[in-house]
Each structure stands twice: as structure tokens, then as C-alpha cells.
Amino acid sequence: GGSCGQCRVEVHSGGGDILPTEEGHINKREAKSGCRLACQVAVKQDMEIEVEDEIFGVQQWECEVISNDNQATFIKELKLQIPNGESVPFKAGGYIQIEAPAHHVKYKDFDIDEQYKGDWNHFGFFDVESKVDEPTLRAYSMANYPEEEGIIMLNVRIATPPPGRLHLPAGKMSSFIFSLKEGDKVTISGPFGEFFAKETDNEMVFIGGGAGMAPMRSHIFDQLKRLQSKRKMSFWYGARSKREMFYEDDYNGLAADNDNFQWHVALSDPQPEDNWEGMTGFIHNVLFEEYLKDHEAPEDCEY
């Protein structure tokens, strides 16, 4: 427990002092106001706590895996089917929690697209195994937006052991997710979230990299497709090389159909075969140098 940091509550009385397992998720100011992780608070006396209203709307669903395909070398798009007649009433930028039972998975059994197997072999990752003796819970942002109904779509990056140190534990949940195949059953709960767009006319600047694509896609699709927003917006995405880029067709289509939207990619390690003539470097630096440095009012943008 205490690893995901998602079960925050306000403890007004009782509960004792904050534990070391909470300090990585709760700063001193938050701790002073009574913020705690519910999973770490032992109930030994009468307590007064406050939880966010949204918690009372949380539900649980048993979903079925529709697909679980590579989008990049170490990123999969997990698409889940919600039970017929039901829906997850989430907002763009929201997240769900996904449950994994105790399990023992072998990386050699993963379905990895042929174009990515070279890197997996190079680092010896197909020799890795992940054994988990108790149920595990983790949070993932939705990549789909609310009008993509009946499904939940996640972008999941696998947390492998560091290359050359394969004896170290692999990511419990990401290893489980990479092992999922079409037709498998998965339990999720939600919706949760606070990373929501404000209802203003301010310019929107989206910044992401890797599996951080998920909430960006949800937000941008929601703004342009559901809300048909005319706000000026741009998406700045960072990838290692051209092979690690994904959803290109989606964003190219949005840019073609919406004059108020642009998207930009910077590669941090372009390969010779990429023949890349675009921007290079880390995306936060590129955003500053190429745009925000000369922006007339960057403080007015919503990020």
C-alpha cells in the first residue's frame, strides 16, 4: 500500500501522525492541513475525515479486453469493453483504477509487435518474469474522450527492470497489463480525476511525452470534437525517435480540420533511418525556445 498516492483524504481528528510511506505523496503543507493516504491510516479511535464528493459516485466494472496492441516499443494501447448498457461517466483528463490479481507473468509470453522485438531482445527483457503475491491497484488516465462510448482506452508504458539489472522487480501492474490478451477480463473502478479543462477562452498548451499521451488525447479530442472549441490550442509532444511516435494520423486530421489547433513533435534521439528534419531535444525545452520565449503572454495560457 501507499504506492499510487490516489486515496487522499482530509483527516480532521484522529489518525495519528503522517507515516514515512506517505511522505513521497504528501508535502509538509498538505500534511499540516490533515491530508493523508486512506490506505495508510489505521483506525484505532474515533475519527473525523473528509473525502471528495466524487468518491461517492465511484463504481466498479468487469471489462473485457478488446485489444492490447503496441503503439511504441514499450507502450501498449489497452482497449477495454464496458459491459453492455453501462457507461463510465468520466470527464476528459480523468482516470480509472485497474485491479490486478496475484499473478505470475513471463515476458516471453507477451504479444510484442515484430518491429519492436529487436529492442526487447537487445535488453534481454523476454527473460524477465513478474511474480506478485497479492492484488494490486494502479491508476491510469483515459486516452479516449467521453463520446467514445462503451470503451476505456489506456496508454501503458511497461516498467521493466533497468537494463543489466534484470534481477530487480518489474512493474507489478504494467507487467500484468502487457500480459493481457483479447477476451481477458479486467476489473476497473472510477471515475476519478481533477485534471480537467477550465471553461474559459484562454489559449491551451498541451505538453506530453511517452505514455503521457493519454490525457492529452482525451482533452484535445474532447475540446475539438465534442465541444467544437474555437480556443487557440497547441500540442507539444516528445518522443525518442520516429518509431516511438503514435496517433500521428489522429492529430494530423485534427490539425487539418481545425484552424485553431496545431501539433508539434520533437525527437530526443532521432535515428539515421528517421531522416528527421523536425525539432530535436526535450519537449519542454523545445516548447520554450520555439514558442513560449517569444509569446506575448505565456502566463495567460492554460497548461
Swiss-Prot record:
Residue stretches making up the 2Fe-2S ferredoxin-type domain: 1-45
Annotated segments matching region Catalytic: 201-303
Cofactor or coenzyme needed: [2Fe-2S] cluster; FAD
Cofactor comment text: Binds 1 [2Fe-2S] cluster.
Assigned keywords, A-Z: 2Fe-2S, Cell inner membrane, Cell membrane, FAD, Flavoprotein, Ion transport, Iron, Iron-sulfur, Membrane, Metal-binding, NAD, Sodium, Sodium transport, Translocase, Transport, Ubiquinone
Main location: membrane
GO cellular component, one term: plasma membrane
Compartments, as annotated in UniProt: Cell inner membrane
Binding site for [2Fe-2S] cluster: 4, 7, 39
Disulfide bridge partners, by residue number: none
Residue ranges annotated for the FAD-binding FR-type domain, each copy included: 58-198
InterPro entries: 2Fe-2S_ferredoxin-like_sf, 2Fe-2S_ferredoxin-type, Beta-grasp_dom_sf, Cbr1-like_FAD-bd_dom, FAD-bd_FR_type, FNR_nucleotide-bd, NqrF, OxRdtase_FAD/NAD-bd
Molecular function in Gene Ontology: 2 iron, 2 sulfur cluster binding; metal ion binding; oxidoreductase activity, acting on NAD(P)H, quinone or similar compound as acceptor
EC numbers on record: 7.2.1.1
Signal sequence interval, chain numbering: none
Source species, domain of life: Bacteria
Biological processes annotated in GO: sodium ion transport
PROSITE patterns per record: FAD_FR
Catalyzed reaction equations: a ubiquinone + n Na(+)(in) + NADH + H(+) = a ubiquinol + n Na(+)(out) + NAD(+)
UniProt subunit comment: Composed of six subunits; NqrA, NqrB, NqrC, NqrD, NqrE and NqrF.
Function noted in UniProt: NQR complex catalyzes the reduction of ubiquinone-1 to ubiquinol by two successive reactions, coupled with the transport of Na(+) ions from the cytoplasm to the periplasm. The first step is catalyzed by NqrF, which accepts electrons from NADH and reduces ubiquinone-1 to ubisemiquinone by a one-electron transfer pathway.
Protein family per UniProt: Belongs to the NqrF family.
Protein's recorded name: Na(+)-translocating NADH-quinone reductase subunit F
